[in-house]
Structures are given as structure tokens and as C-alpha cells.
Amino acid sequence: MRAKPLPPLAVSIGDPSGIGADVALAAWLKRCELSLPPFFLIADPKQLAARARHLGLAVDFAILSDPREAEAAFGERLPLLALKHSHTESPGKPLTENAAGVIEAIERAVELTLKGEAAAVVTCPIAKKPLYEAGFQHPGHTEFLAELAGHHLGKPVTPVMMLAGPQLRAVPVTIHIPLSEVPARLTTTEIVAVSRITANELRERFGIASPRLAISGLNPHAGEGGALGKEDDAIILPAIEQLIREGIDARGPLPADTMFHAPARATYDAAICMYHDQALIPAKALAFDETVNVTLGLPFIRTSPDHGTAFDIAGKGIARPDSLVAAMRLAQQLAENAASRNA
């Protein structure tokens, strides 16, 4: 059993022009109804207060000097750790000048979690274009978090993206690259590395004693013996054979079009897919509002809603907090599992 309660979750606000503020405010207002774990936002107080007024929400904020103050405040006021970089309130209109604050919020969340002052990092969505315009050089959240983790550990980190929902956990081997580049970038070594990390995290944080991995093919019908592509037999099959030699329960390559119906899903704990959409389409189709983006392979827990900034509905009061709520709940569950395992 745990010797002491977990600290609160650290929630970075994401792009302030998107729906991050909308869904974070909505989630806190439903904290009792949804039995949410304590969390604090890392955001610009003025921008967040302006969004609350814009949405007609009555929210009192508790400006924290220490994250440990969050739990006591959580029942009556929304705990908020103020950014040094201010944000301009501009619902639906991403601004390059907000980039520094977006990056700072992520860095602060990671720092506090690594120090043990937060149980996990929960990130609201960011927009890549304004960040790139400000000099950000990472394809997305996942790669930036890996760099921060690498600085902390003093060695490179391999981040693995998992989409986790109530009916499916799906992991893409390649992530944010054009589909045309996938065959050239796919390697046996990378498939083995991603699968190892997935199996380890399923044991360590998800509490699955003997994880079962279903590994997809790349081509239609998993290549059909080479008739529809060589990668399945030349690249993917050797990876599966290596995983089996290491004692990991892995099978495939499986045709992707028959992997995701209910009887197939019942036979594995995670699907290892070869590219972004092969993993994300079934995950989101099965449970769009309940699926959570989890980054595996980091020295801290990180979850995120599975939607983007949704600039077109920001500030309109129609954004649903379901996916953020699911991300918070999963982050808390993973933190509790890890704490129990280490107790």
C-alpha cells in the first residue's frame, strides 16, 4: 500500500486560443459529479479568467505558490500555477506571441512531476504552426517531452505513442511522418524497440502481468506472402521472432483489416501498428470521447486528450471535456498503479 497520498496532477493549458481552457474549466466545474482527482492548471491567470467570463462560467481561482496547496484548494477554487509568459486571449485565433507560454507550461509540468510535486503530466492540445513560427523544432508534444526526459536522464529517450481507450490500446511504430515515407523508415529494430517499451509499460503502469501484443502488417493482407509487398515478411516478421525469443507474447504480422473487431480485440492487450492512421483510426472510431493519448517510455506519466485545439469551436461553450476527463482519470490510475508497485 502507498505510504502517502499522491500529489495532484499537473495540467498544461496547451494553446490558449484553442479549447484547452474551455475543457479544463468545464472539467473542474464537474469535479464532484465526475469524482475527479485533484489537479492544477499551468496557465496565464488573466487569460484563463477572461475565457471563463467569455463562456459565462463562474470560476474562482486559487493562485498557487506551491503545487502542494492544490489539493486543499481544489474543492472550492480551481488551482492555478501562473506562467511567467503571459498569453493573449484570442479564442480561435492562434498567435505566435503565445508560443513561449505554451512551451513554458509543458516544461513546468514535466519539471514538477519529475520532482515528485505532481503525480503525472496531463497536456491540453497545442498547435504546431505558431510554435514553429516561434522557433520550436519538434514535430509535436511527444518528441518535445522525450527531449525534456532525455535532459533529465542524461541519455536519449525513445517515446512511444499509445492511444488507450476502453476497448482498444493502439501503438503506432512510426508517428508524425508522411505516409509515403513509412516503408523506408520502418525497421525491424524500431518495431522491436517500440514493442518492448509497450510490453514493459503494460506490466509496470497498466498492471497487466503478461501483456499480449498483436502486431499488424504494413500492406493489405499483411503482404500475402510477398505478393502485395515485401515489408511484412522482410521487416515485421523478424521483429516478432525476436520479441518471442525475448519472452514477449507477440503474434503477427496480422492483416490490419481484421484486427479491430471485438473477437480479435479480446485476444490482445495492445495492437502494435505500423503507422499513425493505422493505429489512430480504429482507436478514435471505437471511442472518440474516451480515448487518451499516453506517451510511453518516459520517466514520468503523461496523458493527453485525443483531440486537437479545435480553434473553430474555441470560446463557444460547446467543447466537451470528456477526453480530458478520461486523460486525467487514466493518469491518476497509472500513477496509483506505479506507486503500488513501488511500495
Curated annotation (Swiss-Prot):
Keywords attached to this entry: Cobalt, Cytoplasm, Magnesium, Metal-binding, NAD, NADP, Oxidoreductase, Pyridoxine biosynthesis, Zinc
Binding-site positions, substrate: H141, T142, K284, N293, R302
A GO CC term assigned to this protein in UniProt: cytoplasm
Cofactor dependency: Zn(2+); Mg(2+); Co(2+)
Catalytic activity from the UniProt record: 4-(phosphooxy)-L-threonine + NAD(+) = 3-amino-2-oxopropyl phosphate + CO2 + NADH
Free-text comment on the cofactor: Binds 1 divalent metal cation per subunit. Can use ions such as Zn(2+), Mg(2+) or Co(2+).
Location within or outside the cell: Cytoplasm
SUPFAM superfamilies for the chain: Isocitrate/Isopropylmalate dehydrogenase-like
Keyword Metal-binding: yes
InterPro entries: PdxA, PdxA_fam
GO biological process: pyridoxal phosphate biosynthetic process; pyridoxine biosynthetic process
EC numbers for this chain: 1.1.1.262
Pathway: Cofactor biosynthesis; pyridoxine 5'-phosphate biosynthesis; pyridoxine 5'-phosphate from D-erythrose 4-phosphate: step 4/5
Residues annotated to bind a divalent metal cation: H176, H221, H276
GO MF term (any one): cobalt ion binding
A Pfam family annotated for this UniProt entry: PdxA
Summary of the function given for this chain in its UniProt record: Catalyzes the NAD(P)-dependent oxidation of 4-(phosphooxy)-L-threonine (HTP) into 2-amino-3-oxo-4-(phosphooxy)butyric acid which spontaneously decarboxylates to form 3-amino-2-oxopropyl phosphate (AHAP).
Misc. comment: The active site is located at the dimer interface.
Record's subunit section: Homodimer.
Family: Belongs to the PdxA family.
Name the record gives this protein: 4-hydroxythreonine-4-phosphate dehydrogenase
Gene name, Swiss-Prot/TrEMBL: pdxA
